Amino acid sequence: LLILSTGRLALLALDHELAALQAGSRTAFFNAIAVTHEPVWPPAPFEPGALEWAASHLAHDPEGQGWYGWALLANEGERAPPRLVGIAALIGRPDDDGDVELAFGLLPEFRGRGYGGETVGALATWAFANGARRVIAHLDAEDSGAAHTLARVGFADTREQPYPGVARWALSAAA
């Protein structure tokens, strides 16, 4: 298993089996990773199609663990099972320029508590250690919470709008 640890989170890289469970059976996925069952899954901005996309790509790229999906787990106490606070994804391996896109989503009750920053920081560090030269995030141009999270981790608004209402933020690897 590929697991990254932050101060409060364990980021579990999905392999094909876990990605397929997440796309096919929420209950089986929660049981497989031994977390509390969440009534709403996946969190925005992810949709079921994104879960199927990750499972499909991992089926064709079994060595791609880490590039297609991560489960974000927080331990809220010794007696309680871990909580699945959100998911994140690097949208495939880096392109020819070394760019890779990052997306993350947290369940509403976990937003505004620093989990997004921990996730983004850990995944950007992992991506750079594994060949990426720049991590890009696209977000709703009006989403000040996500923009604040990205800025705290060192991302900068590129001032590009790849689509109407969408802002592009980027973080480059240290030279």
Predicted regions and their residues:
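GNAT-family acyltransferases
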Residues: 1-101, 105-108, 122-132, 140-144, ...
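Glycine-rich acyl-CoA binding loop
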Residues: 114-117, 128
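Conserved active-site tyrosine of GNAT-family acetyltransferases
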Residues: 150
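Short, surface-exposed alpha-helical segments at coil->helix boundaries
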Residues: 117, 144-147
